[in-house]
Amino acid sequence: FMEKEKILMPDITYSFYPVYSDLYNVQTKTIPLKEDYTIDINDYMIENNGIIIANPNAPTSIAISREEIEQIVKNNKDRVVIIDEAYVDFGGETVVPLIKKYKNLLVVKTLSKSYALAGLRVRLRNRR
């Protein structure tokens, strides 16, 4: 994320994304949500240095489909696309199965929301 292009994120989203970006001097560009607070995936088909999307979005709780995320990932094959699934257990569809298909897709999760394990650090990995 250290190139001249900016990473893209929705303008209404998890509040720490911009904080962490500033902390590490990563430039960001916020993409406005539509009037109904949904993400227009076409807005993420522009030059960028990466994308981060909470799905379902925090705080709107609106999710985009696996197919829409796959379109974003395909269109940005030379850039990392991070999908934050902190709230996926409350609604939405996981895109974890897509990580086998796309090297540029990173899915992050937390156990603090749906499992009430805030503060516990757990690492899950594939044994292969």
Model regions and ranges:
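Short beta->alpha connector loops at strand-helix junctions that form conserved
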Residues: 11, 30-35, 109
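Short strand-turn motif at the edge of the Rossmann-like AdoMet-binding core
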Residues: 12, 85-87, 110-111
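Hydrophobic/aromatic residues located in beta-strands of well-ordered beta-sheets
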Residues: 7, 81, 105-107
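Phosphate-binding glycine-rich loop
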Residues: 1-6, 24
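Active-site phosphate-binding strand-loop segment of PLP-dependent enzymes
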Residues: 34-85, 89
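Active-site PLP attachment segment
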Residues: 91, 101-128
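Hydrophobic alpha-helical segments in the ANL/AMP-binding
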Residues: 16-23, 124
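Short, conserved loop/helix-junction motifs that constitute active-site signature segments
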Residues: 2, 72-77, 99-102
